[in-house]
């Protein structure tokens, strides 16, 4: 039995992007949206992301302009729950187990997950448990520029930034039933393709639980600035406050 081949699935990637831009003498805008999806190489392994961006600049008056920039993304990642991996995203130990699992024992007999000799079935461990992570990010920037009319060369700038980040992780571990089949041979090491079931075994190394973790952060900054730039003859004067 080639356990890696049985677990492997051909991955697929889908990506779509749409953008619009335009404007007039007083206003300019750019908007875009994106979709990205990738199916994994194993069960319970996939990734989906939605993203958007909007930039609008408007000249409210001859000496006053404002801008609004908004971007964000929403992603959903799903991986098998494998308690032996310290890094759930890389799954190094799961790959190692698939490549090194003994090939002498069939994975399934008559459609039933087999665990006659080695007491567990790595394919069922992958199928029965997952980790799902949802990430949402929102960035907003509001800016304004005022060219002060009664002082030539003096401009006032203001910028407000807001960022919000949301993360929700859910781990699901399920117990599952494996089947012990009749063996033959001098060392009871042979399992026929049509071997009858002689017992069952319930595996709980994935636990039997649901755990949720939630994290949300937000931050904002406000910058106020005065700039003075003016030329007197051959001399340039600049200052920032």
Please provide the spans of the model-predicted regions:
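Acidic/polar N-terminal loop/beta-strand segments that form early-domain functional surfaces
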Residues: 23, 32-34, 71, 147, ...
């Amino acid at each position: 039995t080639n356990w890696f081949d049985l677990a492997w699935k051909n991955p697929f990637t889908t990506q779509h992007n749409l953008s619009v831009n335009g404007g007039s003498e007083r206003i300019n805008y750019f908007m875009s949206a994106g979709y990205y999806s990738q199916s994994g190489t194993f069960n319970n392994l996939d990734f989906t992301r939605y993203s958007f961006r909007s930039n609008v600049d408007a000249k409210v008056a001859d000496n006053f302009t404002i801008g609004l920039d908004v971007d964000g993304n929403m992603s959903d990642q799903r991986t098998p729950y494998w308690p032996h991996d310290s890094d759930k995203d890389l799954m190094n130990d799961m790959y190692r187990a698939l490549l090194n699992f003994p090939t002498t024992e069939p994975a399934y007999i008559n459609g039933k997950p087999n665990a006659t000799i080695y007491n567990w079935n790595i394919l069922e461990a992958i199928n029965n448990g997952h980790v799902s992570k949802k990430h949402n990010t929102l960035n907003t920037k509001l800016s304004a520029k005022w060219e002060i009319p009664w002082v030539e060369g003096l401009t006032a700038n203001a910028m407000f930034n807001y960022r919000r980040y949301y993360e929700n992780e859910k781990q699901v571990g399920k117990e599952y039933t494996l089947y012990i089949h009749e063996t033959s041979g001098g060392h009871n090491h042979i399992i026929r393709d049509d071997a009858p079931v002689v017992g069952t075994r319930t595996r709980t190394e994935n636990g039997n639980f649901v755990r949720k973790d939630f994290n949300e952060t937000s931050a904002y900054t406000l910058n106020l600035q005065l700039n003075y730039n003016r030329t007197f003859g051959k001399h340039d004067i600049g200052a920032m406050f």
